[in-house]
């Protein structure tokens, strides 16, 4: 489907699959900036899961928040944070798998929500958590809690182009994507801006503008289109992480909470690998 205005494709899997024969390939070719699946997860369970995270002590204590200066808290294992020490990374990932076995008890499993919807976008592919040849599994997803002031400047996410993690099996994939499930917005009054996706794939030519934080000027001068993704709790979206993208700063006392994954795919590979 031609997308001359470069808008996200939404609001459900049926619309996405009727628009593209091979949705994941359409994302790879940036025919659309994102797939948004509204109400993919039960919004009522989102609020109750947040309460569970608080009860387990995963979030800042409201009575001590001024003393706790952390801009972000992660529940889960991040290759970006721990990949420099593979032994520590896989040990930590094993603990995450154990935690996620009971963390969502009594609720619809948000992890299953992401994986099942991803499978719908990848016809003929086997979606599973990434692993090494020896069977060591990566973390299946990560829950990120973003507090006041936390933002992400224009950047890309890529195990090779950005992080050069060529010792890990996921470096073999030609394309990398992300899936983000909104559990709570910073602004509880309505839809919140989760990201701005620019119609610009990373190249070495673009890197100087990222390093000098002048990409916004470059985008204006070159009339690069962008798509702003706004989600409500329970909404899920997928996008190509080689697109230059940014996330606005959190404002206020209520954190933004998401469950996120990275996704690896190659046309000739039957596997779709998922990790965090």
Question: Which role fits each region the language model picked out?
Answer:
Residues 148-227:
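Catalytic core of non-heme Fe(II) oxygenases with the double-stranded beta-helix
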Residues 39-41, 142-147, 158, 181-183, ...:
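Short, flexible loop/turn elements at secondary-structure junctions
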Residues 1-26, 144-157, 223-244:
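Generic detector of solvent-exposed, compositionally biased contiguous segments
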Residues 85-148, 164-165, 171:
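Signature of the catalytic double-stranded beta-helix
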Residues 1-101, 105, 109:
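N-terminal auxiliary "cap/dimerization" subdomain that precedes the catalytic jelly-roll/cupin core
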Residues 23-24, 127-132, 248:
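Catalytic micro-motifs at enzyme active sites that drive phosphoryl/nucleotidyl and oxygen chemistry
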Residues 207-276:
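Catalytic core of Fe(II)/2-oxoglutarate
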Residues 32-34, 138-140, 174-180, 192, ...:
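Extracellular structured ligand-interaction cores
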């Amino acid at each position: 489907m031609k997308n001359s205005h470069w808008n996200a494709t939404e609001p459900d899997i049926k619309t996405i699959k009727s628009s593209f024969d091979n949705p994941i390939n359409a994302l790879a070719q940036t025919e659309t900036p994102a797939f948004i699946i509204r109400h993919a997860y039960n919004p009522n369970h989102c609020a109750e899961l947040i309460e569970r995270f608080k009860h387990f002590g995963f979030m800042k204590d409201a009575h001590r928040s001024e003393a706790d200066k952390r801009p972000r808290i992660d529940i889960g294992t991040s290759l970006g944070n721990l990949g420099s020490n593979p032994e520590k990374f896989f040990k930590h990932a094993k603990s995450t798998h154990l935690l996620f076995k009971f963390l969502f008890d009594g609720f619809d499993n948000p992890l299953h929500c992401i994986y099942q919807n991803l499978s719908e976008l990848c016809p003929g592919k086997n979606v599973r958590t990434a692993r090494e040849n020896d069977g060591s599994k990566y973390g299946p997803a990560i829950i990120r809690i973003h507090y006041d002031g936390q933002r992400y400047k224009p950047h890309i996410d890529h195990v090779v182009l950005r992080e050069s993690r060529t010792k890990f099996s996921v470096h073999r994939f030609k394309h990398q994507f992300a899936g983000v499930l909104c559990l709570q917005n910073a602004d509880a009054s309505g839809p919140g801006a989760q990201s701005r996706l620019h119609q610009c794939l990373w190249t070495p030519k673009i890197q100087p503008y990222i390093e000098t934080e002048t990409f916004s000027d470059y985008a204006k001068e070159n009339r690069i289109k962008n798509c702003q993704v706004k989600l409500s709790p329970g909404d899920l979206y997928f996008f190509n992480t080689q697109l230059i993208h940014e996330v606005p700063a959190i404002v206020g006392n209520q954190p933004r909470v998401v469950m996120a994954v990275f996704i690896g795919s190659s046309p000739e590979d039957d596997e779709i690998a998922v990790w965090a």
